[in-house]
């Protein structure tokens, strides 16, 4: 065989290999702007490790909705408030499913199954989501306020102790990770972690769930988009290690609950109610999925928002917000009973606005969990075929200058007026549409209660050392840019009790009210 023939054959092989590895799951969508990429990788290299800000910049050139190639997957990005509202809310019946990804769905989730939020839409997902939504709706949430009473009190009690009555600056992260996680564990299993913020089980769950969150991220695993990379064992080894560690504590928590049910010592909880209901229509795999969802969701939204909300309140600009919030709380509760009344009602509009602005400004899930359309969707005349993956750029939408006035400023006041800022859908901090966060009512009450109690108990101020102060930027504050959710970089805050005697009195009252939960 001549060298020329060998050369032609080699070129042909390379050509067909490139064509094979360069193909996409969905052909190019006609009529929809496309960001130019490179063979095989598509736009992965250009997107880098900050997909939200890169896509936000592209939107200025290619329009609010465009298509990209991420390896062999074609993805449609929506980057403005109105484009998300059109696709995620007005077209929500079509945009109801989720795509599957190799690392999270085939490796990490091979033993426990998928969370509700990461499951493709089918009858099983419908049953699981209905069960979770019923357990987390507004009336049900009110019945959980004793749990929030206990967990918020526990965090504030330890902040008071560990800050030596406000004389030492302190990192609030672990306190409010436990606040959110214990709330979820008590709701789902009737179990709480009773140790301090350094408890071994608490740290293990937080560490593993943060790791698993990275595998759920749309930007962290190139092997999800380039199948050839899956042949390298290191790509799967870390995911498998996290799966084993997660299996251990999920099995432990469920076994403890089942043992308590058998002994008649269990406390009312979501999974316990299902296990004891002879008419429950959920099988073992579906029950595991609900458990998985409650554990992971407890750390997804509330801790990052609350921790960074505290960071802003403690900043120099945050002093004005603290003062107004405290003044507004005192107007409604001049007798100093806000600590207890915030469990029963939500009657301080400024604090409600503060919660909304926290969720918008920090947008702790910058690129929401992806969606997949179950039928064709039309956008500006372009037909986006069934089975296409969609990414909501929640960060870009929540910072959309055509919708929000001065979006880069932290201004709770924007939600006190009937302007475009304050009316309709307030933000995309919980996603949107048919698969938005089912626990949003619970999360709102957690944030509202924590804010009322923190602001009435303490004045929060900048750390004494400049190097301990937080980064007050929603993207730059993230220690892991490719993670699904914001992992705040370490920082410290000063917590000075307004009236130590009164704060201890409130703590003692909460301890008495919630002693049955311990």
From Swiss-Prot:
Belongs to the cytochrome P450 family. Heme binds at residue 437. InterPro entries: Cyt_P450 (IPR001128), Cyt_P450_E_grp-I (IPR002401), Cyt_P450_sf (IPR036396), Cytochrome_P450_fung (IPR050364). It catalyses: 2-phenylacetate + reduced [NADPH--hemoprotein reductase] + O2 = (2-hydroxyphenyl)acetate + oxidized [NADPH--hemoprotein reductase] + H2O + H(+). Pfam families: p450 (PF00067). Keywords: Heme, Iron, Metal-binding, Monooxygenase, NAD, Oxidoreductase. Catalyzes the hydroxylation of phenylacetate to 2-hydroxyphenylacetate in the homogentisate pathway. The homogentisate pathway is used to catabolize phenylacetate and use it as a carbon source. Can also catalyze the hydroxylation of 3-hydroxyphenylacetate to 2,5-dihydroxyphenylacetate (homogentisate) at low efficiency. One of its GO terms (molecular function) is iron ion binding. Disruption phenotype: Increases penicillin production, probably by relieving the competition for the precursor phenylacetate by the catabolic homogentisate pathway and the penicillin biosynthetic pathway. Pathway: Aromatic compound metabolism; phenylacetate degradation. Induction: Induced by phenylacetate. Its EC number is 1.14.14.54. This is Phenylacetate 2-hydroxylase. One of its GO terms (biological process) is penicillin biosynthetic process. It comes from the Eukaryota. Gene3D superfamilies: Cytochrome P450 (1.10.630.10).
């Amino acid at each position: 065989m001549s060298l020329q023939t060998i050369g032609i054959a080699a070129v042909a092989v390379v050509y067909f290999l490139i064509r094979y590895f360069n193909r996409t799951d969905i052909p190019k969508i006609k009529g929809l702007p496309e960001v130019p990429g490179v063979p095989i990788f598509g736009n992965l290299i250009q997107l880098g490790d900050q997909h939200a800000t890169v896509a936000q910049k592209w939107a200025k050139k290619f329009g609010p909705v465009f298509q990209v190639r991420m390896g062999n997957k074609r993805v449609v990005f929506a980057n403005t408030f109105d484009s998300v509202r059109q696709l995620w809310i007005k077209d929500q019946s079509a945009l109801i499913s989720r795509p599957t990804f190799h690392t999270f769905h085939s490796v990490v989730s091979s033993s426990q199954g998928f969370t509700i939020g990461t499951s493709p839409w089918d009858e099983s997902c419908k049953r699981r989501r209905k069960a979770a939504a019923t357990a987390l709706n507004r009336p049900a949430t009110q019945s959980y306020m004793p749990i929030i009473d206990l967990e918020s009190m526990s965090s504030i009690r330890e902040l008071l102790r560990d800050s030596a009555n406000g004389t030492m600056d302190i990192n609030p992260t672990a306190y409010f990770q436990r606040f959110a996680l214990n709330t979820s564990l008590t709701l789902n299993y009737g179990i709480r972690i009773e140790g301090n913020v350094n408890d071994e089980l608490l740290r293990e769950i937080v560490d593993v769930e943060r790791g698993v969150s990275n595998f759920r991220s749309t930007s962290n695993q190139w092997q999800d988009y380039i199948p050839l990379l899956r042949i390298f064992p290191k790509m799967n080894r870390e995911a498998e290690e996290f799966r084993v560690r997660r299996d251990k504590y999920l099995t432990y928590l469920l076994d403890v609950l089942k043992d308590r049910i058998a002994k008649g010592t269990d406390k009312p909880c979501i999974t316990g109610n299902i296990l004891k209901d002879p008419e429950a229509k959920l099988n073992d795999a579906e029950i595991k999925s609900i458990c998985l969802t409650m554990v992971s969701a407890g750390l997804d939204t509330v801790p990052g928002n609350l921790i960074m909300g505290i960071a802003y309140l403690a900043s120099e600009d945050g002093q004005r917000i603290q003062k107004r919030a405290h003044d507004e709380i005192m107007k409604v509760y001049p007798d100093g009973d806000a600590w207890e009344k915030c469990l029963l009602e939500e009657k301080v509009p400024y604090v409600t606005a503060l919660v909304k602005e926290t969720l918008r400004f920090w947008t702790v899930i910058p690129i929401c969990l992806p969606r997949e359309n179950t039928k064709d969707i039309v956008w500006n005349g372009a037909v986006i075929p069934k089975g296409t993956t969609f990414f909501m750029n929640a960060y870009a939408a929540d910072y959309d200058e055509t919708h929000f006035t001065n979006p880069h400023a932290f201004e709770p006041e924007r939600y006190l007026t009937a302007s475009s800022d304050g009316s309709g859908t307030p933000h995309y901090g919980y996603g949107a549409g048919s698969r938005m966060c089912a626990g949003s009512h619970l999360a709102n009450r957690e944030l509202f209660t924590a804010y009322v109690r923190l602001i009435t108990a303490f004045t929060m101020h900048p750390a004494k050392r400049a190097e301990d102060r937080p980064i007050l930027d929603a993207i730059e504050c993230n220690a892991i840019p490719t993670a699904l959710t914001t992992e705040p970089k370490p920082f410290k805050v000063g917590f000075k009790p307004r009236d130590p005697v009164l704060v201890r009195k409130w703590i003692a009252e909460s301890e008495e009210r919630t002693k049955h939960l311990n």
